[in-house]
Amino acid sequence: MSVAEQHPPAAPPTGPGPGPGATRPHRRTLARPTAAGLSAATALLLCVGGGVWAFSALRLNIATLTDSADNAVNFLSRTLPLDFPPTGELLSLIWQTLAIVVSATVLSVVLSVPLALLAARNTSPGAGARAVSRGVIVLCRAVPEVVFAIAAFRVFGLGGMTGVVALGVHSVGMVGKLYADAVEQTDEGQRTALRATGAGRLQQITGAVLPQALPSLVATALHRLDINLRASAVLGFVGVNGLGYALSTAITTLDYRRAMALAVVLLLLCFVAESVSGAIRRTLLQDVTTARRSRRSWPVFPGARRDERPGGTAQARPSPPTVAGPPAGGGTAVRRTLPRWSARRIRGTTWLVLTVALVVASAVRSGLSWSTLRRGAESFLPTLGDFLPPGTGGIGGQLLADLWVTLQIALAGTLIGLVLALPLGALAARNVVGSPRAARFFRTVILLVRAVPELVLAIVFVVVTGLGAVSGALALGVGSVGLLGKLVADSLEETEPGPARALVATGARGHQVFFGAVLPRAWPAVVGHLLYQLDVNLRSATLLGIVGAGGIGYDLLNAARVLQFPVVTTVVLMVLALVLLIEGLAVWVRKVYA
């Protein structure tokens, strides 16, 4: 029996209706568009149109790539065979780079925790403190790390301290924001229980809020460690020791065999770090998700426990004794307040000790010392005076023109990344391809692309296509595949399976299920990721100008070289205004489509 036979149509109304020949009104199947929705759609179309326009204005076409084919062959012949440094020198460079990256990540965590507590709604003492802390976080994220490196170089001079401060302060922009989000997502029940016992605000935060957010905090720190490792290549071009500085020296002397060998080492280092930290992050966040799901799924009764598997049933078991028996000589029973030394606790303590040892060794290798900090504190205010007030140095028109080129590079690179990341992300989603092996293969491809620093891609494209904006747009386009492809795959996998199963039940084919059920539900998240990628590409486009990839980054580096620090401040303010504009657009669009 069909659906129509099971539910016969209702009788028509008895009141006066339309005369013979009149058409029956159609029921709307889509919601009426709102003014906010139309405005957001118009803004997105303008962004896409801007990408197409930038693609054309920069003359990114097949002819440009074809003309560069001979340069690519010549460049490849000049890089082979690869010339790796001696083993001892290579290990020293790797350890120097890792020490700076680890120290910078720890510094960002130390700075981000109090900022996040001030920025989170449930822990902030007031609206003023929340607004100020949020502003500091946004400012740290908007200013490129190379600008912090230029300022830190004036304060601390040559050495690892410059890299630690530059990477650490810039990382606060991302780490602080994610930490604040993690604090806001904690369960208020534990904090309320502590408050009922008379605990103060600090005791509530240390006893209830931070323990819940700890897995997310560690996962975010590991993720930032990967990003800082890739960013360390950029700081080498402003004098920070490590693999990046050796790479910069090789590029300056046109020693492409040594340069590409160092680039391969940096790529493998980033890939290994991304793989290891990714596995740890998945384990930590999976435990948090399972715990939260178990708290929401079924209650806990006295004497019962939740099964460790999601969806398991509560099983009654006697609680272990918590009170030790009376001592032999007679006395008061002692309540045990610390957990027993199980294998899990021993393993966790071992990892904690190794982590602390790594942090201490990294701080020593980076050259961190109280005397360096004291000298930096003494020269901070004089150095700040070198950058203020902002000035144009007589090249204000050129700065505006190069800022426009930087925006074109970011738009074109984002469009290229979108075209490449959408199919790759779809193939990496298990619910789209249906084959775990195929999804795992494309996940690995995306991971390999993400492990390549954008600066290395820019160097390759500068040599192949020549100096200018074309190389920067191509580098950003290929580099965007790593982040945007992963975000697209994650968004597709997180869609609800119900609509897709309903279409499959009607006999729909794979592409019909994808375009009819999976992609529409993931599209709002994909749009948010796309705008975030545009934000990232705009800041990256500023950095790529350092190696001749066009844009305002070239003016930034030249101003720093000739000690025109007011011009550096002007460039930072111009880029900051553009970044804040795009970030505001992204926040508004996500709110409309939420």
Task: For each feature predicted by the language model, list its residue ranges.
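Transmembrane alpha-helices
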Residues: 201-235, 257, 261, 510-545, ...
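Transmembrane-helix boundary motif in ABC transporter permease subunits
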Residues: 103-137, 412-446
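Membrane-embedded alpha-helices of multi-pass transport/permease systems
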Residues: 111-115, 147, 159-190, 218, ...
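N-terminal, non-cleaved signal-anchor transmembrane helix
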Residues: 1-102, 106, 277-415, 422, ...
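Glycine-rich helix-loop "coupling/hinge" segments at transmembrane-helix boundaries
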Residues: 154, 228-260, 265, 285, ...
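Generic hydrophobic transmembrane alpha-helix motif, especially the helices
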Residues: 137-171, 446-479
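Short helix-to-coil transition segments within interhelical loops
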Residues: 185-213, 239-241, 495-496, 502-512, ...
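Transmembrane-helix bundle segments that line or gate the permeation/cavity pathway
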Residues: 3-5, 158-162, 166-171, 176-178, ...
